[in-house]
Amino acid sequence: MTESLRLPAASLKPSTVALPGSKSISNRTLLLAALSDNACEIHSLLKSDDTDRMLEALDKLGVEIEYLAEDRLKVHGTGGRFPNRTADLFLGNAGTAFRPLTAALAVLGGDYRLHGVARMHERPIGDLADALRIAGADVEYLGKEHYPPLHIGERQDNGERVIPIKGNVSSQFLTALLMALPLTGQAFEIRMVGELISKPYIDITLKLMAQFGVQVINEGYRVFKIPADAHYHAPEHLHVEGDASSASYFLAAGLIAATPVRVTGIGANSIQGDVAFACELEKIGADVVWGENFVEVSRPKERAVRAFDLDANHIPDAAMTLAIVALATGQTCTLRNIGSWRVKETDRIAAMANELRKLGAKVAEEAEAIHITPPETPTPDAVIDTYDDHRMAMCFSLVSLLDVPVVINDPKCTHKTFPTYFDVFSSLTETAE
């Protein structure tokens, strides 16, 4: 039987939340450290299902990892060559592990099988596989064409140095290729075919690669040039920023409840694009204060939360939180350019529409957009299905701040990125029940 969690109608206390480490940074950092020619001590690493899958894979590939504390470990780099050239890797539903490992292993070559949960086998990877094959990689589909599971064999250097890749389904494909090609020691040029979505995630990749000694030339997000003789050299210590996507729930809570909420672990100089979520809240009624290591959101009670019509391509994960904020506006709100939601942990446009309707909202879906007209009062005790999607669970917790109780099915799906989320959320709230 599915476990559920009832959140009573609640008010928010003025609060400060220490964010868990960023998933995007944690998994990129683990792989780059493993491929470096020296050791790297990583601090504030996210402890979650997705990072566990990456750590398990690196262990199977022969990477030496010392666990120094719960959120601190030392990765001993392999010099860009994994010791184990044969492995069977289960990667769950962790796209930030599956895509970059696919590219790294395909470029290095070996005898590898990569697979995951059923949903991972429904998430496309064909655009990445096509690009890797142009670079001489041996990538074979073991099930449906263009989808995992995959077998990876030996790469044959065919001399091709210009690699086209599509970026309109997932920016993780480009991230994976960028991180992998320096392992060849050859100069490469990656050329985008069509639109590149979620550019801020590419910025994270490029900034982290630079911290590990590889400078990529970015020509307007159309062409990326990787220098010859590149190799990864890790910083001795690296501190992982807090997760800006996870920050969105607490910052939105401050706006909805008109109560100051501060998150620590990110700030004005964060390398994560999702910090722009706070700027979007400011446009619709929030007061935002930025520090070097914090962001704080509040709202005067007399100021209404304004409706919005937003192109959310730059903040695809955090934009989900705005779908719940829409319920506090009293007017129709629209999120556009969110086609990537369709191929995430679930079809997030369909899932969000289904669950918002349970609350009494009128919702219209398009291929890459969602229009939300809130009810006067959300339906109390609506039972929200979460589709094994951590962000669905965390988003809908905010409904309890709209003066109605809500029931969240499978709350433990948050273990993917934020295992303690509901404990933290409950500690910030007061209930009348």
UniProtKB/Swiss-Prot annotation:
Subcellular compartments: Cytoplasm
Family annotation (InterPro entries): Enolpyruvate_Tfrase_dom, Enolpyruvate_Tfrase_sf, EPSP_synthase, EPSP_synthase_CS, RNA3'P_cycl/enolpyr_Trfase_a/b
GO BP of this protein: amino acid biosynthetic process; aromatic amino acid family biosynthetic process; chorismate biosynthetic process
Active site: 317
Protein's UniProt keywords contain Amino-acid biosynthesis: yes
Pathway field: Metabolic intermediate biosynthesis; chorismate biosynthesis; chorismate from D-erythrose 4-phosphate and phosphoenolpyruvate: step 6/7
Major subcellular location class: cytoplasm
Keywords: Amino-acid biosynthesis, Aromatic amino acid biosynthesis, Cytoplasm, Transferase
Catalytic activity: 3-phosphoshikimate + phosphoenolpyruvate = 5-O-(1-carboxyvinyl)-3-phosphoshikimate + phosphate
Residues making up the signal peptide according to the UniProt record: none
Superkingdom of origin: Bacteria
Residues annotated as binding 3-phosphoshikimate: 23-24, 28, 170-172, 198, 317, 344
MF terms in GO: 3-phosphoshikimate 1-carboxyvinyltransferase activity
EC number(s) stated in the UniProt entry for this protein: 2.5.1.19
Cellular component aspect of the GO annotation: cytoplasm
Chain sites annotated for binding phosphoenolpyruvate: 23, 95, 123, 172, 348, 391, 416
Cytoplasm found in the keyword field: yes
Top-level EC class: transferase
Function summary: Catalyzes the transfer of the enolpyruvyl moiety of phosphoenolpyruvate (PEP) to the 5-hydroxyl of shikimate-3-phosphate (S3P) to produce enolpyruvyl shikimate-3-phosphate and inorganic phosphate.
Subunit structure of this chain's protein: Monomer.
Family statement: Belongs to the EPSP synthase family.
Stated name of the protein: 3-phosphoshikimate 1-carboxyvinyltransferase
Species assigned in the record: Neisseria meningitidis serogroup A / serotype 4A (strain DSM 15465 / Z2491)
